[in-house]
Regions:
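Pepsin/retropepsin-fold aspartyl endopeptidases
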Residues: 1-305
Length: 305
């Protein structure tokens, strides 16, 4: 598949829950074919199967030796078992490594009668050079290159490789009063999140809306409040950098998603800045971004040019 350019599947966009879902098919031990959904999650490094759900719906996997610790940003790590799972996505067959998560995950158990059994992570998308395209809600093989995607043709452009190399996750930069803070570009998230300390330190124009909620990751939850926040996303230009002004609702958390104390360092051992929040799928869908794991760019084409 790495040499093919015609792979494309339609992603399911659910009203009120704008994380993208991909439909996969697989065969159970009795050779019966099943369909299920997986979240297409840019901020999960690994593919994940929700063990009990997968077993309930006839998934057969091949157990591998060893375990792996995984976790959402800011949450405690969870130990998972390792396996390989054979499935079909669109017209392509895959036999891929998965982490088997015991217990449940705070995502719906099904949509329209189709079960949700797991997550496709960014290592899968990097391996097969896939792009999450919010223009037409598809997952497809990267169809751009550094030569045919000019920065001048984009209303927004940020190199995904920076985050993938340093954090293992795609990141963005919010510039506030001359200072840049790091946030994740998280297709699996249904809300924007930002730490209250960042709001305070940066002097953001922020209106607390008063709504209190709890958001949950793979290993835990945290209490948040809704706020309308004005913010500027750093974007590359042909000459230097610029900012794009936005205003959107964020869930304000008491915690960073990834703190310096968690020991994230670059390849030279220098401690990385904390991850103070994330931009979720509803915002990216509204902006019609493309998260392209082939060329490792996040961009929004200027459709009026």
């Amino acid at each position: 598949m790495k040499n093919e350019t015609d792979f494309m599947v339609q992603l399911m966009r659910v009203k009120g829950d704008l994380a993208p879902f991909a439909k996969v098919e697989y065969v159970d031990q009795d050779a019966k074919t099943h369909s299920a959904l997986m979240v297409v999650d840019s901020c999960s490094c690994h593919n994940i199967l929700i063990g009990a759900r997968a077993e309930q719906h006839g998934v057969v996997w091949q157990a591998e030796e060893g375990t792996m610790n995984i976790g959402g940003a800011g949450n405690e790590m969870v130990t998972t078992r390792l396996a390989k799972f054979h499935f079909t996505l669109g017209s392509k067959q895959f036999h891929e490594p998965f982490c088997i998560k015991d217990g449940d995950i705070d995502i719906p158990s099904e949509i329209g009668g189709t079960p949700i059994i797991g997550i496709l992570g960014n290592l899968f998308m990097q391996q097969y050079r896939l792009a999450i395209d919010y223009n037409d809600y598809t997952l497809h093989t990267s169809n751009v290159s550094p030569e045919n995607l000019r920065i001048s043709d984009c209303d927004f452009f940020f190199p995904m490789e920076i985050g993938l190399e340093r954090y293992g996750l795609p990141v963005l930069a919010i510039r506030q009063n001359g200072t840049d803070v790091v946030v994740l570009a998280d297709s699996g998230a249904t809300s924007n999140i930002i730490a209250s300390q960042t709001i305070k330190d940066g002097g953001f124009d922020c209106q607390i809306l008063g709504t209190t909620d709890t958001i949950a990751g793979i290993a835990g939850g945290t209490e948040v409040k809704d706020a309308m926040v004005k913010f500027c996303l750093l974007t590359l230009t042909e000459d230097d950098t610029d900012v794009v002004h936005h205003e959107d609702i964020f869930k304000v958390s008491q915690h960073y998603l990834m703190t310096p104390e968690q020991g994230k360092c670059d390849k030279d051992g220098v401690q990385l800045p904390p991850v103070v929040g994330l931009i979720g799928s509803p915002f990216m869908a509204k902006e019609k971004w493309v998260l392209d794991f082939g060329v490792k760019y996040i961009y929004k084409k200027n459709l009026t040019a």
